[in-house]
Amino acid sequence: MRKQVFDDEIMQESIRYVAAHEIGHTLGLMHNMGASYSFPLDSLRSPSFTKKYSTTPSIMDYARNNFVAQPGDMEKGVKLTPPVLGVYDIYAINWGYRIIPDTNNPKNEKKTLSAWIEEKKQDPMYKFGAQQFYSVIDPTDQTEDLGNDHIRAGNLSIKNLKIIMQNLEKWNYTPGETYSDVAGAYNEVVKQLSLIHI
């Protein structure tokens, strides 16, 4: 993915993610910043795990890329992007919209809806973590985080940022052009560094 212009496949996947996230909002889903915390950090470097679950159980989380993946992980099959729909999203939409037979009003649906909650409440993939706006009260519900170990995730992310910094000019400068692409990439590295939760 070290290119000035992304391949169509990557752009299509990115657009699908943004569209699905926004459609989630139109269906009533709020940001679920606690979703990505349910994944063990090591699982985010596992090809079989990321193939099945991607980076988060909810597209309503801001887990846009697998920044803990290390050189060689992608070649082994580790997925770097969010799911089309996560298991939490499917569950939440089912809970909110599924028709429950033999009920004629919302009060009669309560028993079934409560049972569905009880069934999943011990599974961390179905945890909801509201977006925190003014201060971080719950460290498991942060934006732009991955996995259940923020210290190790931050250290892996910093390792990747160091690789980028060592190659910034090589990957972003076109001979004969200005350094604006290099400057833009540098600003993105600084921005990513500011998002690390350690």
State what each model feature region is.
Residues S36-S38, D42-I196:
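Conserved catalytic/binding loops enriched for acidic/polar residues
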Residues Y17-N32:
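Active-site recognition of the HExxH zinc-binding catalytic motif
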Residues I15-H21, I59-R64:
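A short, hydrophobic secondary-structure junction motif
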